[in-house]
Amino acid sequence: MVSAMVGRGTALGAALFALLAVPAQAGTAAAAGLPAPDDAGLQAVLHTALSQGAPGAMVRVDDNGTIHRLSEGVADRATGRAITTTDRFRVGSVTKSFSAVVLLQLVDEGKLDLDASVNTYLPGLLPDSRITVRQVMSHRSGLYDYTNDMFAQTVPGFESVRNKVFSFQDLVTLSLKHAVTNAPGAAYSYSNTNFVVAGMLIEKLTGHSVATEYQNRIFTPLNLTDTFYVHPDTAIPGTHANGYLTPDEAGGALVDSTEQTVSWAQSAGAVISSTQDLDTFFSALMSGQLMSAAQLAQMQQWTTVNSTQGYGLGLRRRDLSCGISVYGHTGTVQGYYTYAFASKDGKRSVTALANTSNNVDVLNTMARTLESAFCGKSTTAKLRSATSSATTVERYEDIAPGITRD
């Protein structure tokens, strides 16, 4: 174990860096075919995120029995408590992968047809009966993302909804005030509305709440004891990292956004979890523990997002610079950025968290944890030395995706 205290000038800015690599048993090898994780590279990413305005950042890599834990900065700016990889946090759109798992299990059970119209199960919900379940799950429905309006102004938008409680129908109604962005199936267009519809499908087909289905189908079977869906309660249970929202105005004070209902997102973004639980979840998913092989294959039918990313059914694929592809989801919710991804076989998984949002520099920096975790030292060194490494590759977040973050 290596640990060091890193001073940042004030008590509130005191930062802790801690690194722990723990083999489950002697001789456990790194995930087959992958370079060893670059711990120094991961440390550098976290340190950079703090220099760009994140109060704290952390990452956990589960590597075929060996665990790497790194953290730097604070979980609570008021007390100066150091952030740790055991802290719980809001995972934002990583929730979409949980919703997709439930729906694909329902396909396995013969209760849902991916190519059926959404209106088959929710009569009259959508104005175009050509929109299928598959198109909703792959963001090809054309349904407008209501969060573009809700959070066009970041902090005022958040404050206007942080204590509100919406129904699923309320959120769909907000979306349907706008025309669709494309014909069904014609294009990829990320929209939180799609996974609100997913939540409605889950509740209609099971007769139970989304919370109950998550718990019974995923949280309990995988022993995810740090994972919760507490909507509409505003508090994060147990020890957690506070979230800090960056205002749109340059130099504005960070806003503590920890407590909120997240009712504006629900099945699109309201899960709470930890680095360990998200690693466990995506390892289980990619190793075939949560659905049949046939449905896991359906989940990985990719729609092109850009030259290095694809979107399946509630699952992202990111193609790294070393030629390795990883699978999982990103998450943005006010005050939290999450990257949670696993290898194709699920033997290596990584979850990285910075407790801020609306900060494009931090968003891009935290993406580099994937390179360090999956590509190893040589790739990390090349990225650090390359002039292109500072280029912004993420200009959009998972909330208000129509708003460019410059």
What positions do the PLM features span?
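Catalytic loop of the DD-peptidase/beta-lactamase superfamily, centered on the K-T-G motif
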Residues: V2-A4, G27-L70, T258-D406
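Residue-level preference for non-acidic, small/hydrophobic
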Residues: L46, G65, S99, L103, ...
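Solvent-exposed coil/turn segments that connect beta secondary-structure elements
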Residues: N64, A75-R77, S141-G142, T234
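Alpha-helix C-terminal capping/helix-coil junction sites
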Residues: L50, V107-D108, Y214
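Short active-site loop at a secondary-structure junction
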Residues: P55, A78-Q135, N182-S191, Q266, ...
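Short, surface-exposed loop or secondary-structure junction motifs
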Residues: R130-V326, T330
